[in-house]
Amino acid sequence: MSMHFRNKAWIILAILCFSSLIHSTEAVVTYDHKALIINGQRRILISGSIHYPRSTPEMWPDLIKKAKEGGLDVIQTYVFWNGHEPSPGNYYFQDRYDLVKFTKLVHQAGLYLDLRIGPYVCAEWNFGGFPVWLKYVPGMVFRTDNEPFKIAMQKFTKKIVDMMKEEKLFETQGGPIILSQIENEYGPMQWEMGAAGKAYSKWTAEMALGLSTGVPWIMCKQEDAPYPIIDTCNGFYCEGFKPNSDNKPKLWTENWTGWFTEFGGAIPNRPVEDIAFSVARFIQNGGSFMNYYMYYGGTNFDRTAGVFIATSYDYDAPIDEYGLLREPKYSHLKELHKVIKLCEPALVSVDPTITSLGDKQEIHVFKSKTSCAAFLSNYDTSSAARVMFRGFPYDLPPWSVSILPDCKTEYYNTAKIRAPTILMKMIPTSTKFSWESYNEGSPSSNEAGTFVKDGLVEQISMTRDKTDYFWYFTDITIGSDESFLKTGDNPLLTIFSAGHALHVFVNGLLAGTSYGALSNSKLTFSQNIKLSVGINKLALLSTAVGLPNAGVHYETWNTGILGPVTLKGVNSGTWDMSKWKWSYKIGLRGEAMSLHTLAGSSAVKWWIKGFVVKKQPLTWYKSSFDTPRGNEPLALDMNTMGKGQVWVNGHNIGRHWPAYTARGNCGRCNYAGIYNEKKCLSHCGEPSQRWYHVPRSWLKPFGNLLVIFEEWGGDPSGISLVKRTAK
């Protein structure tokens, strides 16, 4: 590239960047078939998803800064209903859920915001973002032409819009919000819902438009989105997408930069060459707004993860879970954004002229009176190609696009990575933990907090998702004449559960454990159990691992033991215990005593030093530690533990489950060719998640309280505090 062209290019880019900052005054946001129009100017916009609750407020400024430095124009986020309205009419907009603060930080950085209100979000988030209390509103049917649902949805949507209006955060008020989204990926659900789904979709659109935000509304994966709402694309590739009207621009709301990690699954990785290829193809085919989902994934703190979703929501994003740059992904995409901006005058002025050079090569040229940009594409997955353009040869690697912002100089090729690869590693700190333990144990059926019902009950209807844990108790009375007492053929206990994990205790001892998976959260426990003459105490601890975040008829989804529960091998054959009298208890003793807090943990006696138990189920552990020096992100290495939850200074850093090892086929990864979430997997046979992020803002200089609840039984002596840093 000539020095003259490079200098000229940087001047143009600087002018474009400066113009993007000028939106602190009131502006008009419209659109035509080419692009969004802001203050009368068509824009090519690069966006990235950063979900505010998946990091801490202290992390937000740096994440937004890195997004801007990476070449983004827009930050995109969902709005998380269950975080903002934990109980009907009681709203929460503080700490990690301070949406207004997050939006203002985006504005201060000179970026726009795409506000996806939903309020259904999916997002691998607990219950898809819906508050669980919504399920128990009389007559409730989710996401269809149902009056109770529409009333609740409209109320929350209006709450968010009114709040943002009051803070003057829409672009037309001088704020950063240039787009709002209503519903989310409803198109596939609409067909399943039939006429009621169609009516609901129409109502949703009309309701949103009636809120008068002054900026365009969008609906993703909604082919029949009515005018003026823009229908948008989600997927790994969207170059072939066309909106449902020639008067609407081509917007891509989710370009998946990787994929989520599930407990029991391998870690997905999407090569940056393929991401860049997908973006270039979208732009060369007339796309004008592209959002990376995710640009920063973050962490599913607390119990916010969807069913079987790992605590880490890293997503193989350009900024990793800890807020560090993932290289070369971040820098390679940054260079792509620079060259797209250099092409912007041509891209927004004309439609492309397309020349086919065979089955697998194409040239897209955008030529106006004052500018020219060309995209040279090679779709072959195995062979490079040399193409001639305007009398000059250009060499294109397989599965790549070269971009010429002056129709002459190759500034960028999607498969030619110039940025260095920087590998991150977890380095143990000098922190030494001195552990104390407290035995949760199996409670009795007559202790405080238990209640009795005939037959089995659904778990979430009792817990209302305030805890992962729900106990089922019953007595099994064995007569002295039972034949198995003499033969030693212990009877077979079989339990069918809607999920997600189950611990079976017989007379206070763990008899076995069973658990499901994301692909099938239901489980069956079937095991011979040892019973004695007289009354035998059966205690079943049912454990939820998040609630489903996708699908239809949320009001029908169940968790816990619904039966049948049978005992086979008694004299009379098989006992169906499902309709017996059962006792129930919500949550754990340790939860009721708030053992995860300083006050709660100080109120009970803990076993110390040589008396600390290991490999024992239902055990609480605590220790204290000082914050290591430096500013590197911190994490807990939980490799020697089984399953449970972790708290630091009262903050729940999420569910841990390192004992659930990753299945899948991990092999060589070739960037070329169509990507899907099962391609380019890593860490097969290892824990799906070993390290758990501990935000530094949650720590004190000295005396931090670390509390762990361990369900399965682990060895806390193997836990270490590590720093994440570059090799």
UniProtKB/Swiss-Prot annotation:
Keywords for this protein: Apoplast, Glycoprotein, Glycosidase, Hydrolase, Secreted, Signal
Active-site feature positions: E185 (proton donor), E254 (nucleophile)
Family statement drawn from the similarity comment of this UniProt entry: Belongs to the glycosyl hydrolase 35 family.
Protein name in the entry: Beta-galactosidase 2
GO molecular function terms noted in the UniProt entry: beta-galactosidase activity
Subcellular location: Secreted, Extracellular space, Apoplast
GO annotation terms (biological process): carbohydrate metabolic process
Record: glycosylation sites: N255
Organ and tissue specificity: Ubiquitous, with higher expression levels in roots and siliques.
Major localisation: secreted
Organism: Arabidopsis thaliana (Mouse-ear cress)
Superkingdom of origin: Eukaryota
UniProt EC number: 3.2.1.23
Catalytic activity reported: Hydrolysis of terminal non-reducing beta-D-galactose residues in beta-D-galactosides
Enzyme category, top tier: hydrolase
Stated induction or repression of this protein's expression: By sugar starvation.
Signal sequence annotation: 1-27
Cited SUPFAM superfamilies: (Trans)glycosidases, Galactose-binding domain-like
GO cellular component, one term: apoplast
Keyword Signal on entry: yes
Gene name per UniProt: BGAL2
